[in-house]
C-alpha cells in the first residue's frame, strides 16, 4: 500500500493477498502476529512488520468455511468456528489441534468471541452459546433471536451483547445465565455491534447503512442516524466516543458518537465490501479484509494519540456540545452527508443526519447526558482505595492463573 514520506509514524506493513475471500481477522494480544481465516476452511498466522509479512503457520482445520479465528486472551491458542458447526482449539506454536467439538452448534457458526477463559459463539439460526474452555463445556445458551447472530461484543466481565439478522440487539448476563434485555426489531438486519461510553451505549451497524445507538440500560431508547450509502458490516472502537466503521461501499470511516460527526476517512478497498476489521495490540495498525481478496494495514496511531490527549477534556466538551445542540440542528441541512465524503480535512467534520428529531426527546437526552458528565467530573479526581486494593488482588490472581489447557 502507499505510504507517506513523513516517517515511520505514517508507515504501515504491505498488503497481504489471498486466493479466496478472507472471513475473519484478529490481532495477537501481546505480539506482532495476526490470524486470518477464509472461505475454504484455512487459517494463516502472520508475523507482520514494515519490512515484510511472514507466514508463521498455515493449516486447514475445517473442510467448510472457517468463519472465525480468534486468539485466546493469553495468546497461546487460536479458537476457530466453522460453517460445519464445529469449534477447534489450535496451539499457535505447533499448529496442533488440541481440542475439537464436532457439533458445537446444530447450525453453522457465524460468530466467535473470547474473553479470558470464556468463549461466546452464535449461529445461523439465532442461538448463542457460552463456553468455559477450562472444562470445554457449555455454561449456558440463549435462543432469543429468530435469525442469524451477526456479531457478539463483550460489555464487561459479566455481560455480552449480540446483534441479529432479525433486526434486534440483546444483552446477556452470562454469570447469572440470564438475558437482561432485548430490543424491538428494526426494519433492517443488524450486522455489527460495539460497546462505547463505558459500556453505557451500544453502537450497531445495519443493512441499510444507518447506525443505531442504544442505551444499554434501556434498549427501547434508541437513536438512529443515516451515514453510509451501504451496509455497515464492521466496527472497531477507538475510545469511548469514537470508532471506525467499515462499509460495503469499501470505505473505512472515523466517526464521533457525541456529537455525531464524520471525523475522517481512513482509507478504502476500492468499491469492494469490507468484511472485517481489527486493531493491533499497540493501537498502531488497523487491519481490514475485503472481497478484493486482500488484507490492508492502515496506520491509525495518530487517531488514538489525538483521542488520548482529548480524554481529559471530553466531559467539558460533551457538556458544551449538548448545550449547543439546538443551535447546531439549524445547520444540519447545510452539511454534506457522510456517504458523499471521499476526502476530509483533519480539522473538520461533517454532521451525520439524525432521524430522531423530537424536541422532547432531545431535551431529555441533554439532561441525562449533562448529569452523566457532571458525575464523571465529580468522580474523576479521586481514586477509591478499596477499589485499588481489589484491582491489585485481581492482578495477583491473574498472574497465578494456570493455563486452562494444561491438561490437554
UniProtKB/Swiss-Prot annotation:
WD repeats lie at residues 17-56, 61-100, 104-141, 144-183, 186-224, 227-265, 268-308. The lineage of its organism: Eukaryota, Amoebozoa, Evosea, Eumycetozoa, Dictyostelia. Coiled coil: none annotated. This is WD repeat-containing protein 55 homolog. InterPro entries: WD40/YVTN_repeat-like_dom_sf, WD40_repeat_dom_sf, WD40_rpt, WDR55_POC1. SUPFAM superfamilies: WD40 repeat-like. PROSITE patterns: WD_REPEATS_1, WD_REPEATS_2, WD_REPEATS_REGION. Keywords: Repeat, WD repeat. It holds the Pfam family WDR55. PANTHER family: WD REPEAT-CONTAINING PROTEIN 55. Signal peptide: none annotated. Belongs to the WD repeat WDR55 family. Residues 322-339, 347-373 have a biased composition (Acidic residues). Residues 308-408 are annotated as: Disordered.
